[in-house]
């Protein structure tokens, strides 16, 4: 992790030092840093709207965009998505320099304006920069592995909900103890999905207490290629044999991905 990023994290922890304002969720040399900032901003009628801003600073940050998630019990999902899109637009203007504090200040000062816009504004209507300028043009695909899923019914419902809200397609795949999630869609939405999965209490620990997902691995992340099948929906599927799972990947033009990332997990 770059020294300037370490300094930024230290500064953020000092700035947001009030009760429950700052929460570091994970930090590593390989996956970057994931943290939450709890703050407030002025709403449509001057009321204080509590905001939960989750950020993922990947290893390449600040030369690449951070992952951003906006949640609030006082806002609709569409309003949260619009706020996230606006923040990503501001982030594109600040690439190559530490930006998190600037982004928090921006949403604090501009939430009222964001909320005054129609809720129909969403991630398929981005206009801040041409897509080709972001380097993320076209759909992306990410393959994830979960170590376990104790509260399976609740967990599956959460995954389906996030995929639907973020317009992601793909598969949640079970084969014995192997659990894989294959996602296709807008890269910023996949990043937000990862933040939600890492910061939400979707499972339970061995004592039955609600807990966050700490054992998720990103096996692959790449642009969807012409030979790859585009999934039309997000589905939950179970496979009784390795051959069935391999056929699923092969039918989607992902035989190489299966050989490189999945086969070794079950041998």
From Swiss-Prot:
Residues 13-15, 100-102 are annotated as: Interaction with UBE2I/UBC9. It is found in: Nucleus; Cytoplasm. Gene3D superfamilies: Ubiquitin Conjugating Enzyme. Its main location: nucleus. It holds the Pfam family RWD. The keyword tRNA processing does not apply. GO terms for biological process: negative regulation of NF-kappaB transcription factor activity; positive regulation of hypoxia-inducible factor-1alpha signaling pathway; positive regulation of protein sumoylation. Keywords: Cytoplasm, Nucleus. SUPFAM superfamilies: UBC-like. InterPro entries: RWD_dom, RWDD3, UBQ-conjugating_enzyme/RWD. PROSITE patterns: RWD. Residues 7-114 form the RWD domain. One of its GO terms (cellular component) is nucleus. Interacts with UBE2I/UBC9, NFKBIA, HIF1A and NCOA2. Enhancer of SUMO conjugation. Via its interaction with UBE2I/UBC9, increases SUMO conjugation to proteins by promoting the binding of E1 and E2 enzymes, thioester linkage between SUMO and UBE2I/UBC9 and transfer of SUMO to specific target proteins which include HIF1A, PIAS, NFKBIA, NR3C1 and TOP1. Positively regulates the NF-kappa-B signaling pathway by enhancing the sumoylation of NF-kappa-B inhibitor alpha (NFKBIA), promoting its stabilization which consequently leads to an increased inhibition of NF-kappa-B transcriptional activity. The RWD domain is required for the sumoylation enhancement activity. This is RWD domain-containing protein 3. It comes from Mus musculus (Mouse). The gene is Rwdd3.
């Amino acid at each position: 992790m770059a020294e300037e990023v370490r300094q930024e994290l230290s500064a953020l922890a000092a700035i947001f030092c009030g009760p429950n304002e700052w929460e570091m969720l994970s930090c590593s040399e390989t996956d970057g840093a994931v943290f939450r900032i709890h703050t407030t901003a002025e709403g449509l009628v001057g009321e204080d709207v509590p905001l939960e801003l989750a950020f993922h600073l990947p290893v390449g940050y600040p030369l690449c965009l951070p992952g951003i998630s906006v949640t609030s019990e006082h806002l609709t999902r569409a309003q949260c998505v619009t706020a996230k899109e606006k923040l990503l637009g501001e982030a594109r203007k600040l690439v190559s320099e530490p930006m998190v504090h600037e982004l928090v200040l921006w949403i604090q000062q501009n939430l009222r304006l964001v909320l005054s816009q129609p809720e129909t504004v969403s991630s398929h209507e981005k206009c801040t920069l041409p897509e080709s300028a972001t380097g993320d043009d076209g759909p992306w695909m990410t393959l994830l592995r979960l170590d376990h899923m104790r509260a399976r019914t609740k967990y599956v419902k959460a995954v389906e909900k996030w995929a639907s809200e973020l317009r992601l397609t793909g598969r949640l795949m079970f084969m014995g103890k192997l659990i894989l999630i294959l996602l296709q869609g807008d890269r910023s939405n996949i990043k937000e999905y990862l933040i939600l999965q890492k910061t939400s209490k979707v499972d339970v620990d061995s004592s039955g207490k609600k807990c966050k997902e700490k054992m998720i691995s990103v096996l692959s992340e790449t642009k969807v290629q012409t030979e790859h099948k585009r999934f039309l929906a997000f589905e939950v599927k179970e496979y009784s044999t390795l051959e069935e799972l391999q056929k699923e990947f092969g039918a989607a033009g992902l035989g190489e991905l299966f050989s490189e990332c999945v086969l070794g997990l079950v041998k």
